[in-house]
């Protein structure tokens, strides 16, 4: 019996740009929303539910000819706290960094408590303390409401 190796489709490497690896499974579309993609110009590759020895399964996003702003990386950390950002130049990874949640998150999310002062006309900036990184759990600085990962994800 002739056992042939199954055909394996591989995504071609990018010459320049960013690869976001180890995204929590099924959250790559949230990452695209954070980055304002698709935008009609950028070449983007999305791989979802890929096998991962670390996570079980993961998503990957490749964006050609674009490097991320620190504010974008901060937002990605909220929905994919184990993500890795790889900067690619001339087909080589020149920089690799894990996303990191800051101790405090400001101005990115809104508090889901309708009675929180940040949801009034006072103009108070949203501010949250990071209680847990995995899973992500935040506490509102003002009303102390806990915000879990699914509530965070729904805002992107």
UniProtKB/Swiss-Prot annotation:
Protein keywords: Metal-binding, Pyrimidine biosynthesis, Zinc
Pfam families named among the record's database cross-references: PyrI (PF01948), PyrI_C (PF02748)
Protein name: Aspartate carbamoyltransferase regulatory chain
GO cellular component terms given for this protein: aspartate carbamoyltransferase complex
Cofactor note: Binds 1 zinc ion per subunit.
Names of required cofactors: Zn(2+)
Subunit comment: Contains catalytic and regulatory chains.
HAMAP family referenced in this protein's UniProt entry, alphabetically: Asp_carb_tr_reg
GO biological process, one term: pyrimidine nucleotide biosynthetic process
Gene name in the database record: pyrI
Protein purpose: Involved in allosteric regulation of aspartate carbamoyltransferase.
Statement: the UniProt record of this protein carries the keyword Calcium: no
Organism name: Methanothermobacter thermautotrophicus (strain ATCC 29096 / DSM 1053 / JCM 10044 / NBRC 100330 / Delta H) (Methanobacterium thermoautotrophicum)
TM segment ranges: none
Molecular function terms from GO: metal ion binding
Family (UniProt): Belongs to the PyrI family.
Residues reported to bind Zn(2+): 111, 116, 140, 143
């Amino acid at each position: 019996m002739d056992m042939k190796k199954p055909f394996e489709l591989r995504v071609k490497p990018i010459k320049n740009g960013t690869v976001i690896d180890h995204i929590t499974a099924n959250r790559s579309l949230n990452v695209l929303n954070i980055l304002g993609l698709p935008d009609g110009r950028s070449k983007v590759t999305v791989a979802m539910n890929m096998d991962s020895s670390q996570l079980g399964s993961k998503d990957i996003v490749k964006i050609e000819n674009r490097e991320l702003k620190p504010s974008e990386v901060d937002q990605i950390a909220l929905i994919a706290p184990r993500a890795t950002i790889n900067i690619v130049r001339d087909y080589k990874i020149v920089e690799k960094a894990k996303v990191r949640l800051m101790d405090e998150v400001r101005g990115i999310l809104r508090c889901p408590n309708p009675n929180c002062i940040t949801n009034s006309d006072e103009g108070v900036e949203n501010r949250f303390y990071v209680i847990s990184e995995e899973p992500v759990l935040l506490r509102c600085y003002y009303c102390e409401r806990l915000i879990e990962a699914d509530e965070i994800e729904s805002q992107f």
